[in-house]
Every structure is written in C-alpha cells, then in structure tokens.
C-alpha cells in the first residue's frame, strides 16, 4: 500500500514510523524541517506526555473524551514513554506527572522521532505544500507544490490553527471539507485571558502568584475554579491555572463574566481578618501603604492599597473594622472583568476541528471516505495542559498506523 501522510508534526512523525514496512510511506511537510511546533512545546522542553493511568488521563480531556477512550487505552502514556526510551530518549517525570526529555531539549524528541521514521524507511519530502487532495475510484491524488502524488491512503496530520508561524494554518480543515466533512469551528484553548482592567494588569505585568485560587464567575455563579500558579500580563492574566480555565470557557458567551482571584485561599475570611489585624497591631504606627509587606508581594501592594479605598497615608491604628473587612474581602476576591480569550494564534492548542462523529474512534479513519484518516490536533479533541494534548496526538497516530498496517 502507498500511503501519504500530510504534516510532519508529532502525530505525522509517529504514524510514519509505526506503519508496517510492507507499505510505502511518504511524509509530506511544508516547512524546511520536521517538528516545528514540537520544537517550541513546553517552552522548548517538550512535555511529551502525562504519566497517569488511562482513566485519569481521560478526565483531563476537555472535548470529546469518550471518543478518545479506545485510542488512549490502545496506546497509553506508558507506551509512549517505552517507545521513546527504546528509541534512545531518556525521560524524567516531574511535578503533576509531566514527562520531559532528561536533556530538557525538545530538539532531542524531534531527533528521536526522525531517526525512528528513517529506520522505518519513510520517504520525507520537506518544503512541499499540499494544495489539494482528491479521490478517483480507489486512488487518491495529492497535489503538491512539487507535483502530484498518487496513493492508496491519506493521513491528514496538519494540526490546528494555533501558532501559525510553525505551519499550523488550518490546511487540514480545507482537505476535510473537500470530502464533505463537518468542521467544528476552531477556537482558542489553553490561552491567556484578556481583561477589561488592563490599566491594573499592566502595572502588575510579570508578577507571578503561586498557590492562589482562581474562579470564573458568570452571572454571579461560579462555573469553574483552579488552584495553583498564574501570572499577570499587559493584557490580562496567564499561567497554568488560567490556561486550564480557558479550555473550560471557550464555548460560552463571556458577557458578564469575571475572573476572581483568592490571594489567600488557605485562610477563611475570619482567619484572614485576624491575620490582618495582627499585622496592623505590629505596624500600628506605620502608614497603610507600608503595613502590607508581610502579607503581599511588593508589586501588588500599591494596587491593593488603591483598590481598598483606604488612603495610603492613613495610620494603621486608625483604620476602622469596616475598612479592614473591605480589605479582607478584596484579598479574597481580587476581581477582573473578562474581555475575551487571547486570539487563537496565541493559544497552545486549537479546540474544534474535524467533527468526531464522522471519524471511527478505533482507527481514526473517515466514516465518509475509505482510507482517509485524520489524526492529532486537526480532530475536534483537546485537553488540559500537562502533556495530555501531545498524548492525544501519539495515541491517534498509533490507532491509524495500526489500522493501515493490517
């Protein structure tokens, strides 16, 4: 069988290296090198998977977890780790079960996959743009910038539309549509959130907060919450908690939605009030602006002082109980109105893509067109941050590779 795989990213490279040698595999990549998006994954360290059991893994898939069940059980994170290690890549498991190459270099992951596909006899065609895919009878014609390729099967592994500079420009959606596949509108997922009060976030830009509780309040009701780390940006908020939250709110109307940060989640209102009171006793002769240094990061103090409504030069010993309670409320509810999610180009992954109702979950073959497959981010599946999205790419690639090897 002659097989063309379109896209030399994570799923395309792994599928190429896994399809049995009885087939002729041609991997077509529009960039000058393979794995361009992999290269920047995990800030250049490449979080290859999450070392957890399939059941726990599926709890971290935000969109279409049920569809992924067969593939995740069929090729687990343990299998990914074994494959990479057998091919010479040493791995290390870090906090939150996140798995990285020991070298901390994403380039080593790309090298490992490149070696595996060369060992498998795959023909790689770089700098080759696929313009269209058509089918006549049982034969596919893949029209490229370097001429047509005829083949028996096509695997679309073109990714989503996030980080377009890496080549993810939504080409796969075009190919899917040409075969009458439905595309679920692509949206940003795992992305920063932009807020209305950018005058405040600009002042706090670069400030990272650890161990905070971040909630999303919509029409007065809490709809999602995350505990952990976050960072302020010129336009709003980002960091691990925010990225996870973005995956949960990218399908809702963001009018009347706010981000609420509990700066002291370990303390109840009463406990925090006692803590503030004891600090005020300790600094009783100081001005208010100089009395919060034990409680808050230096960069945050001027903002909290201003928003508290207490004059900065007020002596601490004359601050009323009511003003103190307002301050405690602010520390437990440091709120920002949501303006929008960051544009899809800035998102870590794309939510949306080829509708899973039209794909066989066991093989990732199109239910509409025989021998046409869709794997990786081009499919409407996405997960939280922590190596889950790459595992989706690996598992879907292997499901297709096994089907094509039969």
What are these regions (language model features)?
Residues 32-34, 40, 54-55, 182-185, ...:
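An anion/pyrophosphate-binding glycine-rich loop and adjacent beta-alpha core
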Residues 126, 132, 302-382:
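A glycine-rich dinucleotide-binding beta-alpha-beta segment and adjacent secondary-structure elements
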Residues 132-149, 154, 219:
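Conserved beta-strand-loop-beta-strand element in the redox core of flavoprotein oxidoreductases
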Residues 4-6, 28, 130, 149-165, ...:
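Short hydrophobic core segments
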Residues 30-123:
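Conserved N-terminal/central alpha/beta ligand/cofactor-binding core
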Residues 2-27, 400-405:
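N-terminal Rossmann-like FAD-binding beta1-loop-alpha1 element of flavoenzymes
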Residues 162-175, 179, 381-406:
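A conserved FAD-binding loop/helix module that cradles the flavin
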Residues 153-199:
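Glycine-rich loop(s) and the adjacent beta-strand/alpha-helix scaffold that form part
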